[in-house]
């Protein structure tokens, strides 16, 4: 758990230092079982989980020329992941597949992504550009981004481990909130309302000493502090339930949390199935 907290602290620190980039909207064509495409780490909004990534956050900010003779028709013409805007012979904007070789060179390992066919791509830009060239094919239809980071061996999730996953997830979300609270001195990592809720969690963090406790004691503690236990889950749910806000989480909405967790927690894929 200490390693996870250290990892989260590093991500939160990097989120504060990173320049804000423009986010891309979700890809329009998504198979129900596929995961939404995920990318480079953008600046984390106030009150957001630093491990949760934004869909399309790998997009490079479009450069603008200092001297613009006429408005570029492509300026406000959106293209989905893997495509770029070009003008046809009538000066009409159109979306075409991006050449993978035109993608920016990766800075480090953290930019690499793994596809569901276990192939590592240098960045999400390279992945989406490659997927675009396969549009209309069976392979392209099935291909999607699986998780962030280079492909690695992920051991199978045992039934006993899967049954414990919700508790690990709840505790992990709680630890994320507590870590953000402890580092929130003027950094605006949490909203004022969130700070008040997490303050209670922080103050009660050590009400039970580590060790084995009777089930009855743990049950009473859970009932007494129910709101404290469920707030981290509600906090994360509220961040993900956005498109649309309907009280349900689709595979697309879960993707920003799922993709960065898979390399760290091998039961993630099975839990979110």
From Swiss-Prot:
> What are the annotated glycosylation sites?
118
UniProt induction comment: By growth factors such as TGF-beta, PDGF, IGF1.
Which cysteines in this chain are paired by disulphide bridges?
Answer: 74-85, 79-95, 97-132, 103-125, 114-151, 157-267
The Kazal-like domain sits at 91-153
Q: Name one GO molecular function term.
A: extracellular matrix binding
Q: In which tissues does this protein get expressed?
A: Detected in chondrocytes.
Where in or outside the cell? Secreted, Extracellular space, Extracellular matrix, Basement membrane
- The reply on keyword Disulfide bond is yes
Question: What UniProt keywords are attached to this protein's entry?
Answer: Basement membrane, Calcium, Copper, Disulfide bond, Extracellular matrix, Glycoprotein, Secreted, Signal
Question: Which InterPro entries does this entry report, sorted A to Z?
Answer: EF-hand-dom_pair, Fol_N, Follistatin/Osteonectin_EGF, Kazal_dom, Kazal_dom_sf, Osteonectin_CS, SPARC/Testican_Ca-bd-dom, SPARC_FS
Per the record, the similarity remark reads:
Belongs to the SPARC family.
Report the protein name in the record.
SPARC
Question: What organism does the UniProt record list as the source?
Answer: Oryctolagus cuniculus (Rabbit)
The gene from which this protein is expressed is SPARC
């Amino acid at each position: 758990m200490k390693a996870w907290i250290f990892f989260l602290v590093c991500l939160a620190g990097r989120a504060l230092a990173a320049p804000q980039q423009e986010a891309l909207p979700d890809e329009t064509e998504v198979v129900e079982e596929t995961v939404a495409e995920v990318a480079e780490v953008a600046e984390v909004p106030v009150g957001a989980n630093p491990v949760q990534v934004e869909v399309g956050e790998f997009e490079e900010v479009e450069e603008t020329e200092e001297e613009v003779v006429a408005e570029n028709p492509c300026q406000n013409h959106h293209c989905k992941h893997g495509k770029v805007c070009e003008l046809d012979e009538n000066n009409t904007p159109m979306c075409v597949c991006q050449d993978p070789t035109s993608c920016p060179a990766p800075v480090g390992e953290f930019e690499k992504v793994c596809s569901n066919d276990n192939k590592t791509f240098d960045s999400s830009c390279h992945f989406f550009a490659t997927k675009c060239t396969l549009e209309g094919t069976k392979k392209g239809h099935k291909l999607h981004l699986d998780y962030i980071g280079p492909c690695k061996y992920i051991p199978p999730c045992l039934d006993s481990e899967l049954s414990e996953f919700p508790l690990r997830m709840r505790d992990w979300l709680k630890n994320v909130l507590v870590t953000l609270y402890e580092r929130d001195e003027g950094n605006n990592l949490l909203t004022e309302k969130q700070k008040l809720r997490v303050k209670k969690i922080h103050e009660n963090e050590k009400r039970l000493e580590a060790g084995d406790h009777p089930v009855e004691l743990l049950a009473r503690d859970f009932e007494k502090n129910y709101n404290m236990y469920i707030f981290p889950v509600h906090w994360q749910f509220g961040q993900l339930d956005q498109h649309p806000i309907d009280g349900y989480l689709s595979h697309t909405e879960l993707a920003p949390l799922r993709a960065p967790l898979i390399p760290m927690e091998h039961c993630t894929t099975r839990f979110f199935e």
